[in-house]
Amino acid sequence: ESSPLDFKIEGSQPSRVKATHIANAANLARRAGFNELQFVKDISPRLGEMVKVLFGLAQPSFSNPLQRPSFIYIPELTSKPFYDIQECEGLKSWIQRLQPFKDELLDIGKVSKSKYVEEFENLPNLEEWNKLRDEWLSTHLIKGGEHSEVFKSLSEPLREVLERAPLAHCPPHAPEMFVSVLEPGAYIPPHYGISNCKLTVHIPLKVTKHASLKAGDEIFKWENEQSAMIFDDSFLHSAKNESDEVRIVLIFDIWHPDLSSLEKEGLAKFMTKFAVWNNGVGKLANLDTQLRRK
């Protein structure tokens, strides 16, 4: 008898027997993932609820209708689009240590060539997104917790500062750190991030008051290059640069300030285990969904 791994959902409508095998394989894959990951329920009830929502055993109870993370949703975390720097432990003092190195980071932005849009999955084939491919450029310093070759080429003092950044360390989900360049007139259409366990920080390298970001129903506008922007990208958000100069910022992930140390450790372990499952038996988890679309 064929293994579920041999099933291919192609061609004609599968028979009822084959459909049953496919559904069983998907259910077994989901069960394996749930059993492997529900250890987080012993860390906190809200992490246990997170796993139930992820595997479709509970419906998410979003605190705000404009918040819809596509991957991980942890209930009972403070839900608001923007945060003050004082709410994020250690961030203000770290940014002060970064100030002397802004020119070095700005130089990276001036030669950035990578199309950041290509980092997204399942983007709609819309003119706004296609146009953005040449207008939103980037250079990664850290991706999935791994240092890039560009990071390794930085001056030793800057590397030391970046290595002490208060990042949300839960690879391969996070952290990400990159220099982001938005060309004059560029517009990033509204979209949701993938989790609410972390916040996104923008450190200005070259900004103008005509560059802004909207998250939820609030808008942040740059007033000067000494400020920082912290927002929850699980909210619907968009950005635009209405000036005639490029906007260049350093972007990175930090933990949501409501999470305890134990929850952060649990999430780091969770992301590692999820990646193993997702790249293995987890590939079968959506077979029945694909079948229903046929």
Would you name each region that the model predicts?
Residues 199-204, 228-230, 245-261:
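A short hydrophobic beta-strand segment most commonly corresponding to one strand
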Residues 140, 178-180, 204, 214, ...:
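Residues in well-ordered beta-strands of folded domains
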Residues 188-191, 211-213, 231, 237-243:
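Short beta-strand His + acidic residue motifs that chelate non-heme Fe in jelly-roll/DSBH
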Residues 205-224:
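A short beta-strand-loop-beta hairpin characteristic of the jelly-roll/cupin
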Residues 1-178, 182-192, 208-211, 261-294:
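Fe(II)/2-oxoglutarate oxygenase catalytic core
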Residues 98, 174-176, 185, 198-202, ...:
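Extracellular structured ligand-interaction cores
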Residues 189-205:
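Short beta-strand/loop turn elements enriched in aromatics
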